[in-house]
């Protein structure tokens, strides 16, 4: 839609999370299950590519597209993980996106949600009902690492209209 393209065009960084499965990869491309190569780009990937080209033409810079691999498993050597990594790398070259590791599958993230917390919030025994564990601290570090890997542009803009992006028709 027009609004979707406009929102994408105004973004400095586009983050697309995918889980470790070929089902999620379908949002980027159709993959041949027999030889692990992509057959075609998805409508979403084509839209993002078009918007990035338009942004390059109108502003001389493009959108930083980052695919974030989420719910990472400790089974890095599983057949599925190896195949998926190969295809994502191939797609990153073709579609010019960066790949960043996201967050692991951690029970602690499910623990935070019902009490309205994120891994970056302050938490202690009073808030959690128990002393924070190494898992809580590891989750926080994982989120901090993800944010660092995104390499987001400086958001400390001056007040007023300086630095604010205006959509180009």
Each PLM stretch: what is its role?
Residues 60, 64-169:
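C-terminal lobe/tail of nucleotide-utilizing enzymes
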Residues 1-101:
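Conserved catalytic-core segment of NTP-binding enzymes
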